[in-house]
Amino acid sequence: MGVTDHRAYHHGNLRAVLLAEAERTLREHGPDGLSLRELARLTGVSHGAPRRHFADRQALLDALTATGFARLADEMCAAIEETGPDYRTRLRAAAAAFVRFAVHDGALLDLMFASKTDGHHSALPEGAVRLFSAVGDLVRQGQQAQVLPPGDPERLRLLLIATLQGIAALITSGRAHAEQTDDLLDDTVELFTR
């Protein structure tokens, strides 16, 4: 959506329109390019209208983070559910969904994992809880099937997320080529499973 598309705004959906425009701006200009006033201009509403939905810029960033975590959780859960019972296939599908999201929405993923909570904003968004729970469940299933090593499932969950985030960072930064994605994901599954 851009300046010319502001006519798509209808009473009652301004929050969704602002978030969509904020995601586009984030993709193109990074978090420093986001401001409530600029979002108002881009969506064709009064400069005060975004404040009805976001008290300040941090509230907008928090909402983007929550939206991103919810979407990533949905995509990873769907990828897991669409595969058969083979654990390695399920792990590979979840890993691929994470990296796909990161490649498409790298700036959003950076924002999601860079967000810090303070006393003024909510703790972990519900989507983040779902995402981390889904990865934790996947780890526990692998341990129960004796495909993943025994030990602290929380440690393995964090290690898996860190590995996937690292692969995504390498690809989005150009330090690894996109053509290497499949091999990197296959190697990840191979390294984690036994």
Question: Where is each model-derived feature located?
Answer:
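Short, basic, alpha-helical segments at the C-terminal edge of helix-turn-helix-like DNA-binding modules
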Residues: 66-73
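Helix-turn-helix
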Residues: 14-17, 21, 25-59, 63
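Amphipathic alpha-helical packing segments from all-alpha helical-bundle domains
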Residues: 101, 110, 120-147, 154-158, ...
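Short, hydrophobic secondary-structure boundary micro-motifs
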Residues: 35, 109-113, 121, 151, ...
